[in-house]
From Swiss-Prot:
Function as written in the Swiss-Prot or TrEMBL entry: Part of the ABC transporter complex BtuCDF involved in vitamin B12 import. Binds vitamin B12 and delivers it to the periplasmic surface of BtuC.
Protein name: Vitamin B12-binding protein
Keyword Lipoprotein: no
Keywords, comma-separated and alphabetical: Disulfide bond, Periplasm, Signal, Transport
């Protein structure tokens, strides 16, 4: 279960193993990396992607060479890519090392901040035929972030709980993705200080922390009524502050994260207006 969840939650940092020059055959090994590749102007160079790469629509038509269980090492080598966009937090380290041993150039993408989304687009754009496309996408992303920061009041905090899965109940802690999206909007994570990056928690622990807002997503719950019996114990339920987020927007650090920010910030603003 945790491996499946991690497919949506990449950690963002990047490193390059080759000189920046245009490439012709690109493989992406994570859904967020696929979206970043398109934004960077490499969409027409992609020849294979990860199993859950479904955006943009064209990505869904490409050959699938990885999933939460691992990567198809022999197939990737046979495709002779001149750039693989890898995700160290989700792709097996031993398999990535084997790709390197076969001389496959790898761009490593892991997570950190919203700014890293723009940085990764810029870096990958250097491998496209027209780097200006990716540079513009990165610039537009930064400008929209600035506009959103000016629009929403983030000084007044809202205590929230974000549910990543149902059985077991898993959430996010610390600065791990997508915590920064919620922080951007003035959110205060009720499990922020938990040691594990994606801790398993109990219903009782959630109730004890009394979140004002409870966020889920379509990937998080099969039973929409799992919290209903706790309405009297949870402020979020008593005040109808339970919302389902678009999991692709919120869990993948890509240009579409801007949509997640708007979604989360609007929910928080509605809570503040009722105070």
């Amino acid at each position: 279960m945790m491996n499946k969840i991690c497919l949506y939650l990449p950690l963002f940092f990047s490193s390059l193993t080759m000189a920046n020059e245009p490439v012709e055959r690109v493989i992406s090994l994570a859904p967020h990396a696929t979206e970043i590749a398109y934004a960077a102007g490499l969409g027409d160079k992609l020849i294979a992607v990860s199993e859950m790469s479904d955006y943009p629509k064209e990505a869904g038509e490409l050959e699938k060479v990885s999933n939460y269980q691992g990567i198809k090492l022999e197939r990737i080598i046979a495709l002779q890519p001149d750039l693989v966009i890898a995700w160290p937090a989700g792709n097996p380290a031993k398999e990535l090392e084997k790709l390197k041993q076969f001389g496959v150039p790898i761009y490593y993408s892991t997570t950190g901040t919203l700014e890293d989304i723009a940085n990764n687009i810029e870096q990958l754009s250097q491998y496209s035929d027209d780097p200006s496309k990716g540079q513009k996408a990165a610039r537009d992303f930064r400008e929209e972030l600035t506009a959103l920061k000016a629009k929403y009041n983030t000084t007044e905090k809202v205590r929230y709980f974000y549910q990543l899965s149902e059985k077991p109940i898993i959430t996010v802690a610390g600065k791990n993705w997508p915590s920064e999206v919620f922080n951007f909007c003035g959110g205060e994570n009720v499990f922020a200080n938990t040691a594990a990056p994606y801790p398993q928690v109990s219903i009782e622990q959630v109730i004890t922390r009394q979140p004002e807002v409870l966020f889920t997503s379509r990937h998080a719950m099969s039973d929409d009524g799992m919290w209903a019996q706790w309405k009297n114990e949870l402020p979020a339920l008593r005040n109808n502050h339970v919302w389902s987020l678009n999991s692709d927007w919120i869990n993948r650090p890509t240009p579409r994260t801007l949509n997640a920010i708007i979604e989360v910030c609007e929910h928080f603003e509605s809570v503040k207006r009722k105070r």
